[in-house]
Amino acid sequence: MQNIIENARRLYLGLLQKKLPSYQRDTLEKISSSNAKIMGLYGARGVGKTTLMLQWLKQQNYTPSQTLYISCDHAIFKETNLFSLVEYFVQHGGKLIVIDEIHEATDFEQSLKSIYDFLEIKILFSGSSAISLSNPDFSRRFAMFSLPQLSFREYLEIKLGYSFQKHLLQDVLEKGIDLSFEINQRLENEKILPLFNEYLAHGGYPYYFEDPISFPQKLNDTINLVLQMELSHLFSIQPDKIDLLKKLLVVICRSKPLELSIEKLTTNVELSKPTLYKFLDYLQKGELLRQIPHELKKYKSIRKADKLYLFHPNLLSVLCVKGDIGTLRETFFASQLAAANHLVEFTQQGDFVIDEEIVFEIGGKSKDFSQLKTLEKPAYLAIDDIEVGTEKKIPLWLFGFLY
């Protein structure tokens, strides 16, 4: 076990010698203010979990001998029992350990529970989004934190080097004209619409800034790793089914959400209905797919199929040769509202209903209120290709400032 600890220290030293990004996401502050014994960080592959954990680790007031970083996807940890490793570390003075890619460890759920019950040590671990979603016991025992893809606001902060305030949805609705004016004025020599189009293509994943040219290939590699490593491992998916998962994503990417049906998908991907439903659930847990329920689905007597979107607009640029612009806009809107912890459902009049109260129609400059005029609920248009809106016609890009 001592050899494994020494190897872990060498790997950690190598990581620390690399320059960490100076940009710090809001989730880092949330984790830093937590007093929980064991904390978990979950999110899609590629959103910056490792970077955030290393930033947090450098802020802690422990000596090097009292801290340890391990990544469970590294070969030296593959056959190591996680509880035994942490127990040995505690017995030799360990106070804090950061565990990356914990879902790669054998029987990690039981190991974490045993560590929580029997060992005195502070832990921050990371893993696939599917960990938190598939194991409700985690959120009861541990402090769990979500790290979403970069918002449009965060993308601008990294690209331009200065900060923008995030805004509540109510402020966007009530003060949209003033907010959009203020943001446009701060851009100096930049224009908001070209920046927004950049974000839709590549702005959700921080590694874009490391090597913009190779971003499409790296995002495609990320998708393949989620399918081949995370989902196949967590849900025991047979290797011959992985290509069907990828095919399912491509079919969804190339289709308009309202034109998709379970029958069409079972035919196109050659899956039975029960298997298809399982695969859709796996893809959502891996943050590759977003299933949006109808607002009436909560009434069991009313059966409505979910609308299916890719999880983030960047995925369309890799999985579709040319995606539908309407789908791209709706994907962005749903991704920003959901990441800001709003309930997103679809409705017959309009595109989405948010928090069961507010209806939104998404579209281009020519979109009007004709589809919304008979609604009793408050209704707004989220419009692409405009820099500044009107009272109930809000620039689509402004919904990227919610988190």
Located regions from the model:
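Hydrophobic anchor at the beta1->P-loop junction of P-loop NTPases
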Residues: 38-41
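Structural recognition of the conserved hydrophobic beta-strand(s) that form the central parallel beta-sheet
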Residues: 98, 122-128, 146
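Conserved lysine of the Walker
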Residues: 49-50
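Pre-Walker A adenine-sensing motif
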Residues: 16-34
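Conserved P-loop NTPase "ATPase switch" module shared by AAA+ and STAND
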Residues: 90-108
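Accessory nucleic acid-recognition modules appended to NTPase machines
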Residues: 207-348, 356
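Short glycine-rich substrate-engagement loop in P-loop NTPases that contacts/grips substrate
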Residues: 64-94
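Interdomain motor-coupling "hinge/lid" segment immediately C-terminal to the ATP-binding subdomain
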Residues: 2-14, 128, 134-242, 249
